[in-house]
Design a protein with these regions (language model features):
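Broad, structure-driven detector of short, well-ordered beta-strand segments within folded domains
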Residues: 140-155
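Ser/Thr- and Asn-enriched, surface-exposed coil loops between beta-strands
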Residues: 28-39, 152-166
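Intrinsic-disorder/low-complexity loop/linker signature
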Residues: 20, 33, 72, 136-137, ...
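Generic structural motif
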Residues: 22-28, 47-50, 124, 151
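Extracellular receptor-binding modules and their adjoining Ser/Thr/Gly/Asp/Asn-rich linkers
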Residues: 1-2, 41-135, 143, 163-198
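An N-terminus-focused feature that recognizes amino-terminal "leader" regions
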Residues: 1-35
Length: 198
């Protein structure tokens, strides 16, 4: 187990593991201000490469989060759904798995995509949009927690990404045998991005 500390505005932590030994990202925790710690774990000693991307997140007059790239161009806002995000970064997205879940425990969305990047890497990521509702209180205009998770892959191959819709309890009318839901509903999904030209 290792704790990796870094400083970033709104981080996307990714890792490259070519050793054949599974490495799991357990958690990413804010330790104050722009300081973060990501904990990774493997069952035996292993070396990995990791990358931390810090997005420039600004809040405009409508209180929506806007993500800008290094050129100052808006890439995405917290009100965008996945089809719009795909249009904004058209040509770089090679796969997407948008989905919507309510009273649903288990694999929410899973997809695979083949890739052969031109000398770059493939980003495997997830974005949870701000339509999460907890016990009747709508959390609007925010991305909760980390923007993304996943890793880079070089060369050619197949990437698979899955997300889960967790329950928040204790009241669940559907199904009755799962008593862990605050009437939660959230949009989520995964994207595969060819970052070789970015």
């Amino acid at each position: 187990m290792a704790d990796i500390a870094y400083s970033a505005t709104n981080p996307l932590f990714v890792m490259e593991n070519t050793n054949g030994i599974p490495v799991v990202v357990i958690s990413t925790t804010n330790t104050g201000g722009n300081s973060w710690v990501t904990r990774v774990m493997a069952l035996s000693p292993v070396s990995i490469n990791y990358f931390v991307f810090s997005s420039d997140v600004l809040i405009d007059g409508s209180e929506l989060l806007v993500v800008y790239n290094s050129a100052g161009q808006p890439v995405a806002t917290s009100s965008m759904r996945y089809p719009l995000i795909k249009q904004v970064i058209a040509g770089n997205v090679i796969g997407a798995g948008p989905d919507y879940g309510q009273y649903d425990y288990g694999a929410a969305t899973s997809f695979s995509a083949s890739f052969s990047p031109g000398g770059g890497r493939i980003g495997v990521g997830a974005i949870r949009t701000p339509s999460t509702q907890f016990n009747g209180s709508l959390l609007s205009g925010e991305w909760r927690g980390n923007i993304g998770l996943g890793g880079w892959m070089s060369g050619a191959g197949v990437a698979t990404f899955s997300t889960f819709n967790w329950r928040f309890g204790p009241s669940s009318p559907n199904p009755p045998n799962f008593q862990y839901d605050y009437q939660s509903a959230l949009d989520y999904g995964g994207i595969l991005i060819d970052v070789s030209n970015l």
